[in-house]
Amino acid sequence: MRRRHHPRTRSRCRFLLTIRIGSLRTAFSGVSTLFLLNGVVADEFTQALLALDVAREVGIERIVYLSVIHSDLYVNVPHFAGKFGVERMIEQMGLKATILRPAYFMDNEITIKDAIAGYGIYPMPIGTRGIAMIDARDIAEIAALELIRRETADGPLPLTRINLVGPDTLTGPDVAAVWSEVLGREITYPGEDFAGFEQSLRQFMPSWMALDMRVMAERFVTDGMVPEAGDVDRLETLLGRPLRSYRDYAAQIVG
């Protein structure tokens, strides 16, 4: 998508969801601000680096990159480690960017809400360290604000990282309690069965991706996704409103 943001600059912003190597230079022609989001695919790291290499080549100096929280901590999770490699490239090559680092998306619950209601369990193995899940709508709004901030600035702005988290840090039992309240009957958290989790995922995704997700879940349990002090306040200041809560999201998708 291309759009004009500011009459003074008459510039264009490129939203890039997938990368076609042969058309990168054409796609980036005349673009001043880039939003880079790469799918979880086997060559995600290569795609991201090539996109940024071409962006640097054509002179794009305003970038917003969607990474992931704790990319530097979850070193054995492929789609986390790849994103951290991209972050390192951005920093060491001196690119002017906002790196957004979202936690686990609340929106993933869409895929398991029927299982929760049907079997009376919360099946995601998220453990008891705590996960600060965030609504994708909040991610999108913050990303848009950062794109506009960079696009309309007088010059390229320095590198910054923003953790994107929800207002509550919830454990597996906490989430089960939320669903119990929303559904009006008991929902339990059965604990972690990583082998079973991987096997279930292999029914609808490639085996390499299922293992990637299993290893991620194992790190949920050992490390959690806990925000840093001040993260929630920073986001609510940016948005000018409270972050969306997990309970409200669960109630919404139940209908």
Map each language-model feature to its residues.
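Oxidoreductase cofactor-interface core, primarily capturing Rossmann-like NAD(P)-dependent enzymes
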Residues: 1, 29-31, 40-42, 49, ...
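NAD(P)-binding Rossmann-fold cofactor-contacting core
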Residues: 1-7
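Conserved Rossmann-fold cofactor-binding substructure of NAD(P)-dependent oxidoreductases
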Residues: 7-32
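Structural motif corresponding to alpha-helix initiation and N-cap regions
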Residues: 18-21, 45, 49, 194
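Residues lining the SAM
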Residues: 37, 66, 240
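A hydrophobic C-terminal alpha-helical subdomain
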Residues: 155-157, 195-255
